[in-house]
């Protein structure tokens, strides 16, 4: 199994009429999703070829991009880790470097690294019906453009816009004499020792940064518009570490993973069915952690738990910093920045030397790649999800969008397994094309693709694929159900049409009729 070299733009190794691609699968992204797909291919499709196209110079994706203080997982590594590779560290809530080490070790031990083309940004991908393949065009840092053809395009590029975060605009920003930083572009040599820091935001990024910066900063203030629900849990999983001492690594990992998956699922469903009970539980934990520092106004959100993702606070580290007087949380609205800090609408002023704008991320679908079908631009928002990874009337395209109520990698594992079974079925049947077919008069009841109120998700609704009320045409948010259903659901389910290459003149009327 090998990976093709990328060809200079305009150069082809085969005639333009050939239906033989350079590789079976072009994987976009060398983060969790991409490395996971490569590993699954080597286990399940050893006769198939692939290439990983990665715009950065390192493995890791999100975990290589974000470098702010304390960067860590917001899920336990027994579920954020892959199903096939045990997590061996003592801490189950892992920091960024440990996650990078995990990914790099997998890439090296499994021989994945030689298949990665680093410094390669994917610009576009066009599906050619006549040849039944994708032509993927790329550009390196020197501006050299190349292309590669693939039977299947696998988008493991995550959902963050790496170039443009959601950076809220504040009046008077240019007046501030200190340093303003967005966490997505953290400077490597920032010196904040002895300085007053204000972190704007109360999401996972802010909750991570605040306690981490208190070790050097004079004081750190989290400035929030509205409170967030926090979940306190130990950074180390006592059961996992006990099992590792008495059982084989893979067995201990599987037991812990099963336990954590079921617990995640139970908590989410309980939050939706009995929100008051979950509120009481979370509040009691926060009160116990803060003691007399607890303030109901600061820690009582105007929404139910899991209407937005819970923010994890490992070992109650942020609350320990607040108790120690090294950090505090202010609930207010910003009027404007000034020379020495932030003027709030309440009239209060926050003095600051450094302001961190942890105001959110901008979501993107498919890594902002210009996708087209026989030269006609494709818009994800015009298509329904199929089995949470393919799209109505779009051939040979698989994309990963992880769970919102559980670890990202849980869905990535399911999708990699499905994609490999799809590849094997296509090869066994002599098929070149796999298309989830949806008739124009489908009658599907459309549902909200995100059943969450988080701002970063709501801002992205216009670019997201559609999600129906019923399977298989939806992005489901229940891993336990999905795992059983995806395994039991056959590839040839009466919806996914398998076929061979056909001229575009024949393919286009079929697509138009389906749409």
Model region roles, listed by residue range:
Residues 274, 281-370, 446-515:
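C-terminal catalytic lobe of FAD-dependent flavoproteins
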Residues 23, 142-152, 193, 345-354:
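Core beta-strand elements of the Rossmann-like FAD/NAD(P) dinucleotide-binding domain
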Residues 90-161, 289, 336:
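Feature captures the FAD/FMN-dependent oxidoreductase FAD-binding
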Residues 2-3, 20-116, 224-225, 288-292:
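Beta1-alpha1 glycine-rich phosphate/pyrophosphate-binding loop at the start
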Residues 87-105, 117, 200, 270-278, ...:
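Short beta-strand to alpha-helix junction loop
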Residues 15-22, 26-27, 32, 37, ...:
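Rossmann-like dinucleotide-binding core of oxidoreductases
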Residues 80-82, 180, 388-405:
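Short FAD-binding loop at a beta-strand-to-alpha-helix junction that anchors the flavin cofactor
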Residues 2-6, 206, 228-232, 241, ...:
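C-terminal, flexible cofactor-proximal segment of oxidoreductases
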């Amino acid at each position: 199994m090998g990976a093709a070299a990328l060809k200079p733009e305009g150069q082809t190794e085969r005639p333009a009429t050939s239906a033989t691609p350079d590789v079976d699968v072009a994987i976009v992204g060398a983060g969790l999703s991409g490395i996971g797909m490569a590993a699954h291919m080597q286990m399940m499709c050893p006769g198939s070829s692939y290439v990983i196209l990665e715009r950065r110079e390192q493995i890791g994706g999100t975990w290589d991009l974000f470098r702010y203080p304390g960067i860590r997982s917001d899920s336990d590594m027994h579920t954020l880790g892959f199903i096939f590779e045990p997590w061996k560290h003592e801490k189950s809530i892992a920091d960024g470097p440990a996650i990078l080490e995990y990914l790099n070790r997998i890439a090296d031990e499994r021989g994945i690294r030689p298949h990665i083309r680093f410094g390669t940004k994917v610009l576009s991908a066009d599906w050619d019906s006549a040849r039944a393949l994708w032509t993927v065009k790329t550009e390196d840092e020197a501006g050299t453009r190349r292309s590669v053809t693939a039977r299947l395009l696998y988008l493991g590029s995550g959902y963050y816009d790496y170039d443009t975060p959601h950076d809220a605009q504040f009046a008077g920003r240019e007046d501030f004499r200190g340093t303003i930083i967005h966490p997505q572009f953290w400077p490597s040599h920032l010196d904040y020792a002895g300085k007053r820091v204000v972190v704007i935001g109360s999401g996972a990024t802010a909750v991570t940064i605040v306690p981490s910066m208190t070790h050097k900063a004079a004081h750190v203030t989290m400035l929030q518009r509205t409170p967030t629900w926090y979940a306190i849990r130990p950074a180390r999983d006592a059961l996992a570490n006990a099992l590792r001492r008495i059982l084989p690594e893979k067995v201990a990992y599987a037991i812990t993973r099963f336990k954590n998956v079921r617990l995640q699922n139970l908590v989410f469903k309980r939050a939706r069915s009995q929100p008051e009970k979950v509120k009481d539980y979370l509040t009691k934990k926060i009160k116990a952690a803060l003691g007399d520092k607890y303030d109901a106004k600061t820690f009582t959100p105007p929404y139910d738990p899991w209407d937005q993702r819970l923010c994890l606070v490992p070992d109650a580290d942020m609350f320990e910093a607040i108790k120690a007087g090294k950090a505090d949380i202010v609930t207010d609205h910003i009027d404007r920045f000034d020379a020495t800090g932030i003027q709030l609408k309440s009239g209060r002023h926050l003095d600051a030397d450094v302001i961190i704008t942890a105001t959110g991320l901008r979501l993107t679908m498919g890594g902002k790649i210009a996708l087209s079908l026989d030269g006609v631009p494709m818009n994800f928002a015009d298509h329904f999800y199929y089995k949470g990874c393919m799209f109505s009337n779009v051939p040979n395209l698989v994309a990963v969008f992880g769970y919102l109520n559980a670890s990202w990698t849980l869905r990535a594992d399911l999708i990699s397994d499905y994609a490999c079974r799809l590849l094997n079925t296509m090869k066994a049947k002599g098929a070149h094309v796999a298309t989830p077919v949806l008739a124009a008069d489908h009658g599907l009841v459309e549902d909200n693709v995100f059943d969450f109120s988080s701002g970063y998700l709501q801002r992205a609704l216009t670019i997201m694929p559609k999600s129906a009320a019923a399977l298989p045409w939806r992005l489901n948010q229940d891993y336990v159900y999905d795992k059983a259903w995806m395994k039991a659901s056959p590839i040839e389910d009466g919806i996914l049409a398998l076929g061979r290459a056909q001229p575009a003149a024949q393919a286009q009327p079929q697509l138009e009729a389906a749409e």
